[in-house]
């Protein structure tokens, strides 16, 4: 039997940890020995209002079980809130080792109903909030030569017509994750993402409706990505209902032709789309080398 993966002495910050999936993350990390900052603004699923109760309740659960945690209600959509959140970890324990960006909102709408306000609301929390917390924690990770970041994307990036703003924001998380991973690798910082699936209030389904979709079944993947033994960087994993899998971007071999015409594209459409022999680029440089390899005869 493998040895238990522990977080003793580590400090983890979890955003959106007052309910649902974030709560499951915080409880598991604390149970494995981490000091946890339980961040939650306490807003509605659409981002309205604030309530200190959810974060405080999770902290009570953790401490009652013998764990170590403090509540935090800063709004990470703003720079000041994200700075204060990271500052709370530093003030209490003098360090930050792992950051789990789980906070999010959902306002269902697709075109023609979705407007710029809807899009901006999703970007503010999902994209700006994730960026703000990472930016606040990054210097501390770099100084110690160690850091783990777990961002939250969604299977919605595969196509979610009823919530365009949400899917758009979650797509941005993938680009952010992969870019930060390349920057963090030489610094000892690993940045990955999780696409969770569980019954929560955000999905308009409460825990208990589907026992197999319990948020606790997602948490092991997030915890592993936040652990020092995590071997990957810049990757995305789906998690839910007890199933874990890798979600990745790939490119087909395609068709090579000098000075092509529109008609050439049509004529070779099947070859362009043939997924046989696809490759998975590690980053932009890797993709560029592959895409332009025909120019040097390789």
Enumerate the predicted regions with their spans.
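A glycine-rich helix->loop->beta "capping" turn
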Residues: 7, 65-68, 88-101, 107, ...
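Catalytic loop of short-chain dehydrogenase/reductase
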Residues: 150-172, 177-186, 195-211
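The beta1-alpha1 cofactor-binding region of Rossmann-like NAD(H)/NADP(H)-dependent oxidoreductases
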Residues: 52-56, 73-84, 116
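A short, exposed helix-loop element centered on a Lys and neighboring polar residues
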Residues: 134-135, 178
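C-terminal helical subdomain
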Residues: 193, 210-297
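Canonical Rossmann dinucleotide-binding motif of NAD(H)/NADP(H)-dependent dehydrogenases/reductases
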Residues: 4-37
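Substrate-binding pocket helix/loop in short-chain dehydrogenase/reductase
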Residues: 62, 110-111, 118-120
């Amino acid at each position: 039997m493998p040895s238990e993966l522990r977080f003793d002495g580590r400090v983890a910050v979890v955003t959106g940890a007052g309910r649902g999936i974030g709560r499951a993350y915080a409880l598991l990390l604390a149970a494995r020995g981490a000091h946890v900052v339980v961040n939650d603004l306490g807003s509605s699923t659409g981002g309205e209002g604030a309530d200190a109760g959810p974060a405080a309740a999770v902290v009570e659960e953790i401490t009652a079980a013998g764990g170590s945690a403090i509540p935090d209600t800063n709004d990470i959509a703003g720079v000041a809130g994200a700075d204060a959140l990271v500052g709370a970890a530093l003030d209490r324990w003098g360090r930050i080792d792992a950051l789990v960006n789980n906070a999010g909102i959902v306002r269902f709408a697709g075109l023609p109903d979705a407007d710029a306000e809807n899009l901006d609301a999703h970007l503010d929390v999902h994209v700006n909030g994730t960026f703000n917390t990472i930016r606040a924690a990054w210097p501390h990770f770099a100084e110690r030569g160690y850091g783990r970041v777990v961002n939250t994307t969604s299977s919605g990036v595969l196509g979610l017509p009823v919530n365009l703003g949400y899917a758009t924001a979650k797509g941005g998380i993938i680009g952010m994750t992969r870019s930060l991973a390349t920057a963090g690798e030489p610094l000892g910082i690993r940045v990955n993402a999780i696409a969770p699936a569980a019954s929560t209030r955000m999905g308009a389904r409460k825990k208990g409706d589907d026992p197999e979709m319990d948020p606790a079944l997602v948490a092991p993947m997030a915890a592993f990505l936040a652990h020092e033994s995590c071997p990957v960087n810049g990757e995305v994993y789906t998690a839910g209902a007890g199933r874990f899998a890798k979600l990745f971007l790939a490119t087909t071999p395609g068709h090579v032709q000098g000075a092509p015409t529109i008609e050439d594209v049509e004529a070779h459409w099947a070859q362009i789309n043939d997924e046989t022999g696809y490759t998975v680029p590690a980053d932009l440089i890797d993709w560029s080398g592959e895409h332009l390899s025909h120019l040097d005869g390789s």
